[in-house]
């Protein structure tokens, strides 16, 4: 599973920023224009590359409704830069591994100029050490681990218009004599492809969720348009019915006792909620449900249908969720994530949602802010802050953010090392003014 995502020189980010994903639930917070959307956009780009897409198609993606990136290709880079980097860390049964890649702008086109995958053995699984040269060139050289002694590793040719790990998923890519390379490298590359391409970026669009969807469409889309068919599959599995109803209890002023489905003539379905008041059941199909109800249903479908070990990203989770039910919803998300071995990344700027976070999720909150001097975006995990307990005892997390106390603490609070330096400086000044003072 993904344990961290990295970016450098991407849009508002300059120095390498790390988004830790070590806990079941990570919440990304920060003011408007702090850079939260840029983090998610960079992660979306890496996921898009893992699906085998070519860089030449990226500008077309800008014009799509579910676009990968916003703006023009040159807008992806930190101002004044012509290269940015993306990467991630992964943990699985085989151990820890990491992926890093750098992309460069030549003329109007993007090129991958560096890509490397490490598995902790001291020798990279592969390393693009011969990038293409020239504005029109796209052929690059990649050294790969042949698992034999000797520092000189064999090379193969790849295109710099696709992620290298999306090209090395076949044993035929390697020399016939390098049997272990033929076995190991495609296996790891396929695992990375599956893990990254299966990241679900959930940003439900209620208007698209009020129609029938085809039963064959079993993987929830980011906009939730096929919500009904995914819920149908989950409901038919039986053992997940209780989990679904528990999520739906996040809805206020409703007593939902079950789901039903309208069936169309083309193998399509539309979900119905069964609501019971005073012992009388009534059915309400998706076309009649509120935006908030549809969003909660989409979150439930995402959490229960995502492949185990995968990452689910829920953007602006507070939209349509009543504050009185926020805690229940977040507790359900965390419980299901832990049970199904998922990683969940939420973004929000709603103080009520932050105050509703389960206590054990608070250290994994990641604060995104702009540096006061350089203006670049930065990320910090609250649990990693020096003297973090000193911050948390002051007030609730939501009020700390809205009052500006969190922002001031992160930007101005001296950590232990800074305090040591201040103490040394004070002692040095004391010795200078009073020569008789000893240590």
Model segments located where?
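Pre-Walker A-like glycine/lysine-rich segment at the N-terminus of P-loop NTPase domains
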Residues: 1-83
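Catalytic acidic motif of RecA-like/P-loop NTPases
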Residues: 11, 44, 318-321, 351-352
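Short loop/turn elements that form and flank the Walker-type P-loop nucleotide-binding site
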Residues: 21-23, 306-308, 339-341
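C-terminal lobe/lid and adjacent interdomain/linker elements of RecA-like ASCE P-loop ATPase modules
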Residues: 78, 251, 328-439
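Short glycine-/polar-rich loops that comprise or flank the Walker A/P-loop
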Residues: 82-84, 110, 197-198, 361-364, ...
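Conserved ABC ATPase signature
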Residues: 226, 249, 253, 257-304, ...
